[in-house]
């Protein structure tokens, strides 16, 4: 099974991607995580990518396409996967279809801009296990202690400022809305209400994918 999660940054794709991937026993591939890993390396490619991220701009198609193709052609992904954050535009979708022959399902996370900004501004994660929290909506049960692993070290994304987020949303809409129209005619396009809480969204996705 190949499932694509579409939606603006902070819509909940990563959280749901990890959960659903575990349920159906396939890898979760998050393009944002891949590029954040690259940025931590001391390479010219990392510096180039980091410049786009800091300015709230989308990374050029040719860079994104090559990175994601290298991942997906690995034997690790031959039995399917959940793809989070790719493709983002028509050019990327057409590139994806040029080397992927399996049927796919596309799930779009529809969410209000105001809620999206709060979700992104408040987002942080445990450095040890990666559990995601939010200073507005989801704090650890014990202050500064991860619910999952007990670590007290957390990671706050420095690129998540309100100005950058608003620019990212604007760029996303310009780039991705034509892609949504394209996929709507595929017969395999579904919309979930990203403004619902985490558990409700998970249930909606499970119904779409016909899993328990």
UniProtKB/Swiss-Prot annotation:
Which transformation does this protein catalyse, written as a reaction? Answer: AMP + ATP = 2 ADP
Q: Which InterPro entries match?
A: Adenyl_kin_sub, Adenylat/UMP-CMP_kin, Adenylat_kinase_CS, Adenylate_kinase_lid-dom, P-loop_NTPase
Q: EC no.? A: 2.7.4.3
Residues holding Zn(2+): 126, 129, 146, 149
Positions with a binding annotation for ATP:
10-15, 123, 132-133, 196
Q: Which GO terms describe its biological process?
A: AMP salvage
Task: List, alphabetically, the Pfam families matched.
Answer: ADK (PF00406), ADK_lid (PF05191)
PROSITE patterns reported in the protein's UniProt record? ADENYLATE_KINASE (PS00113)
Query: What job does the chain carry out?
Result: Catalyzes the reversible transfer of the terminal phosphate group between ATP and AMP. Plays an important role in cellular energy homeostasis and in adenine nucleotide metabolism.
**HAMAP family linked:** Adenylate_kinase_Adk
User: How does it associate, per the subunit comment?
Assistant: Monomer.
Listed name of the protein: Adenylate kinase
Q: What is the organism field in this record?
A: Rickettsia canadensis (strain McKiel)
* Record lineage: Bacteria, Pseudomonadati, Pseudomonadota, Alphaproteobacteria, Rickettsiales
């Amino acid at each position: 099974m190949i499932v694509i999660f579409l939606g603006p940054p902070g819509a909940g794709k990563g959280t749901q991607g990890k959960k659903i991937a575990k349920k159906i026993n396939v890898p979760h591939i998050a393009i944002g995580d891949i590029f954040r890993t690259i940025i931590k390396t001391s390479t010219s490619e990392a510096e180039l990518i980091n410049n786009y991220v800091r300015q709230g701009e989308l990374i050029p198609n040719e860079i994104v396409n090559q990175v994601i193709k290298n991942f997906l052609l690995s034997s690790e992904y031959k039995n399917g996967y959940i793809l989070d954050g790719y493709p983002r535009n028509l050019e990327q979708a057409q590139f994806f279809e040029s080397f992927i022959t399996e049927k796919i399902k596309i799930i779009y996370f529809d969410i209000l801009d105001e809620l999206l900004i709060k979700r992104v501004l408040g987002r942080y994660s445990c450095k040890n296990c990666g559990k995601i929290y939010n200073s507005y909506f989801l704090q650890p049960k014990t202050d500064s202690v991860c619910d999952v692993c007990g670590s007290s070290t957390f990671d706050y994304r420095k690129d998540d400022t309100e100005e950058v987020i608003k620019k990212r949303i604007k760029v996303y809409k310009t780039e991705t809305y034509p892609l949504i129209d394209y996929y709507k005619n595929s017969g395999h396009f579904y919309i979930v209400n990203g403004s619902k809480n985490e558990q409700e969204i998970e249930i909606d996705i499970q119904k779409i994918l016909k899993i328990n």
